[in-house]
């Protein structure tokens, strides 16, 4: 029987509670559970990894061509996911690699779809979207507005990898969203 989960954190909790025998979980959330950090008050036991399915990318999306680096997000309105969500902590990790905190931006807390709508309507400057590329929220936005992905440079990627071993460096090919 197929069941719909409520996200990685809830899925881990259901495994531990015994209400699920098998569940999907993002690698960062699994690390939080194992280490008892961020989404988890203490170390979680009673789960293990079976397989990795696909890679999700931390995508920083904007319709403003002047925003080229994460540092350019300072003072800008940025959707960083729901408070306490995996996206939220990914955003905090990436901002931190650039010496920025949540206080350095004007944070909004929105879903992928709401973030794309807010970008389309000019209500926010950028959004963190964590999903496999391509993802519908970005694809749909790119069909209606000039859309840009903000890149991380190698110096700051190295800083991020030093503190968060659940990330890996990857490149999203230009043609994934923007054609040739």
Regions inferred by a protein language model and the residue ranges of each:
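Pocket-lining segment of extracytoplasmic ligand-binding domains
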Residues: 27-29, 37-38, 102-180
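Short secondary-structure transition/capping segments
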Residues: 20, 42-58, 97-100, 129-132, ...
């Amino acid at each position: 029987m197929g069941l719909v989960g409520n996200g990685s954190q809830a899925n881990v909790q259901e495994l531990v509670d015994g209400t699920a025998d098998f569940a999907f979980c993002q690698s960062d959330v699994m690390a939080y559970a194992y280490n008892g950090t961020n989404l988890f008050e203490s170390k979680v036991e009673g789960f293990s990894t079976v397989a990795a399915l696909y890679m999700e990318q931390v995508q920083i999306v904007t319709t403003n061509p002047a925003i080229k680096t994460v540092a350019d997000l300072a003072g800008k309105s940025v959707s960083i996911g729901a408070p306490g969500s995996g996206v939220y902590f990914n955003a905090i990790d990436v901002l931190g690699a650039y010496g920025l905190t949540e206080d350095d931006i004007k944070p909004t807390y929105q879903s992928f779809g709401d973030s794309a709508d807010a970008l389309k309507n000019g209500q926010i400057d950028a959004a963190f979207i964590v999903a496999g590329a391509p993802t519908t929220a970005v694809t749909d936005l790119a069909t209606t507005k000039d859309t840009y992905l903000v890149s991380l440079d190698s110096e700051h990627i190295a800083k991020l990898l030093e503190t968060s071993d659940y990330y890996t460096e990857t490149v999203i090919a230009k043609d994934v969203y923007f054609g040739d």
